[in-house]
From Swiss-Prot:
NCBIfam families with a match to the protein in the record: nusB (TIGR01951)
Purpose: Involved in transcription antitermination. Required for transcription of ribosomal RNA (rRNA) genes. Binds specifically to the boxA antiterminator sequence of the ribosomal RNA (rrn) operons.
UniProt GO molecular function: RNA binding
Keyword RNA-binding: yes
Key words of the record: RNA-binding, Transcription, Transcription antitermination, Transcription regulation
Similarity-based family: Belongs to the NusB family.
One Pfam family, short name: NusB
Protein name (Swiss-Prot/TrEMBL): Transcription antitermination protein NusB
GO CC entries: cytosol
Keyword RNA-binding in record: yes
Single Gene Ontology BP annotation: transcription antitermination
Coiled coil regions, renumbered to chain: none
């Protein structure tokens, strides 16, 4: 899968995770179905893998994030930042085929710059760096 397809999948996974936090009564598959006609099937498949992985490992992922965050509780982090962190930690630590930390961190930072606040990129970078060092 090309990097751009993976980036699209991560961005889609972020959108789905974000939406399901505000509408937990709607299944995440419903949100993915909205994009099925407009995106490459491999993007949908990888996004589904990420969302499923994050949801299945949410407690352990949040525990790793919390252990690396000296000043922020996971539930108090901005929803976008929290879900970007979850995606990156899933891909680094919980995926069946984990990706390299530097790739996960770079992807997360770029997505944070695109979707988060002006501080999101540096926040995500610093926290994921701590997650990497804690491993």
């Amino acid at each position: 899968m090309k990097l751009t397809a993976r980036r699209q999948a991560r961005e889609l996974a972020l959108q789905v995770l974000f939406q399901t936090e505000f509408a937990p009564q709607i299944s995440y598959q419903t949100f993915l179905e909205v994009f099925e006609q407009s995106l490459d099937p491999e993007v949908i498949t990888y996004a589904d893998l990420i969302v499923t992985g994050v949801k299945s490992n949410k407690e352990a992922i949040d525990s790793k994030i919390q252990a690396s965050s000296a000043h922020w509780k996971v539930e108090r982090m901005a929803t976008i930042d929290r879900n970007i962190l979850r995606i990156a930690v899933y891909e680094m630590r919980f995926a069946a085929d984990p990706i390299k930390e530097n790739i996960a961190i770079n992807e997360a930072v770029e997505i944070a710059k695109k979707y988060g606040t002006s501080d999101s990129g540096s926040f995500v970078n610093g926290l994921l760096d701590q997650v990497g060092k804690a491993h």
